[in-house]
Curated annotation (Swiss-Prot):
A single GO cellular-component term on record: cytoplasm
InterPro entries: FabA (IPR010083), FabA_FabZ (IPR013114), HotDog_dom_sf (IPR029069)
Encoding gene per record: fabA
Organism phylogeny: Bacteria, Pseudomonadati, Pseudomonadota, Alphaproteobacteria, Hyphomicrobiales
Record Gene3D superfamilies: Hotdog Thioesterase
Catalysed transformations (reactions): a (3R)-hydroxyacyl-[ACP] = a (2E)-enoyl-[ACP] + H2O; (3R)-hydroxydecanoyl-[ACP] = (2E)-decenoyl-[ACP] + H2O; (2E)-decenoyl-[ACP] = (3Z)-decenoyl-[ACP]
Pathway the protein contributes to: Lipid metabolism; fatty acid biosynthesis
Name recorded for this polypeptide: 3-hydroxydecanoyl-[acyl-carrier-protein] dehydratase
Enzyme Commission number(s): 4.2.1.59, 5.3.3.14
SUPFAM superfamilies tied to this protein: Thioesterase/thiol ester dehydrase-isomerase
Subunit structure: Homodimer.
HAMAP family in the cross-refs: FabA
Amino acid sequence: MLNRRNGYEYEDLLACARGEMFGPGNAQLPLPPMLMFDRITDINDNGGEFGKGLVRAELDVKPDLWFFGCHFKNDPVMPGCLGLDALWQMVGFYLGWSGGEGRGRALGLNELKFSGQVLPEARKVVYNVDIKRVMRAKLVLGIADGWLSVDDQIIYRAKDLKVGLFKQGTSLG
């Protein structure tokens, strides 16, 4: 299990995806190709818009990323749902990083707006989540607002991203 740090490299993220970071049965990132960022550049529990925590991550855009080959033929664009999933991944990572126990599941969001797209010629995607609230009861629930920028232009905004950590035997419903 890694010590709590304020940044993580790709190999660290892969260790998290293998279940080696937060302990057995606890939060994991997905393995590639569904792991949607290359590094976490900042994570803390007192920053962000609401002063309750922040996670910032980056994806280096390359024309050979897997989704460009299939979405869409002769019109490659990163699927919007993958950027949204990255934001949920980051909230789940934050919950594990902050000591929450259980397996992570995305539970929804209240609002999502797209105002641009990620194309193969882009250089870098930056993801940001600002933690609004963490509740620790039967399950651990994180609520955050987030955004995605491509080459320094914000193109997605998400409000009230919800992720829960569920211990074995706890139902989603």
